[in-house]
């Protein structure tokens, strides 16, 4: 095997290892939220604001993407991706998150925060600009 192929092979292995290690530390959640119908409009305003500010202002917040069920508008899902546990903990302490959390406590009927395992972590950089 010539030197050029060895260098290319080494670079490829190094890149794959780096991506795998990076994604091992990432936190991925799919928040499952049910909102009381009478508070839905106000809740959506809070959610959109905190998600926008978090992505704009926090380097460790890769994605906060809110979605609403087409079948039941009171069911909200938020795709949450943080660069690390430290980024997640930092996010919880921000003024905009605290405003959201305290402002919506009475609006939320049910909340689940399951941690997810990405099945194709190598595509993260293709999808999320902040991962590049």
Language-model regions, residue ranges each:
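Sec-dependent N-terminal signal peptides
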Residues: 6-15
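Sec/Tat signal peptide C-region and signal peptidase I cleavage site
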Residues: 16-20
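N-terminal targeting signals for Sec/Tat export/insertion, comprising classic cleavable signal peptides
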Residues: 27-57
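N-terminal secretory signal peptides that target proteins for export/translocation
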Residues: 1-3
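Short, well-ordered beta-strand segments in beta-rich or mixed alpha/beta enzyme
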Residues: 26-34, 63-92, 130
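An amphipathic, aromatic/His-enriched active-site/gating alpha helix that lines ligand/cofactor pockets
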Residues: 53-63, 81-116
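Alpha-helix boundary/capping residues
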Residues: 13-14, 47-50, 95, 104-107, ...
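Glycine-rich beta-strand-turn "strand-cap" elements at beta-sheet edges
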Residues: 21-28, 65-72, 101-132
């Amino acid at each position: 095997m010539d030197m050029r192929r060895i260098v290319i092979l080494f670079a490829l292995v190094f890149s794959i290892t780096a991506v795998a290690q990076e994604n091992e530390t990432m936190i991925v959640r799919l928040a499952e939220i049910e909102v009381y119908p009478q508070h839905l409009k106000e809740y959506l305003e809070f959610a959109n604001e905190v998600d926008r500010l978090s992505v704009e202002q926090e380097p460790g917040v890769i994605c906060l993407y809110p979605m609403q069920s087409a079948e039941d508008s009171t069911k909200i899902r938020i795709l949450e991706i943080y660069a690390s546990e430290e980024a997640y903990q930092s996010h919880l302490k921000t003024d905009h998150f605290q405003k959201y959390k305290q402002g919506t406590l009475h609006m939320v009927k049910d909340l689940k925060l399951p941690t997810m395992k990405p099945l194709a972590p190598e595509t993260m950089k293709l999808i999320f600009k902040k991962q590049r």
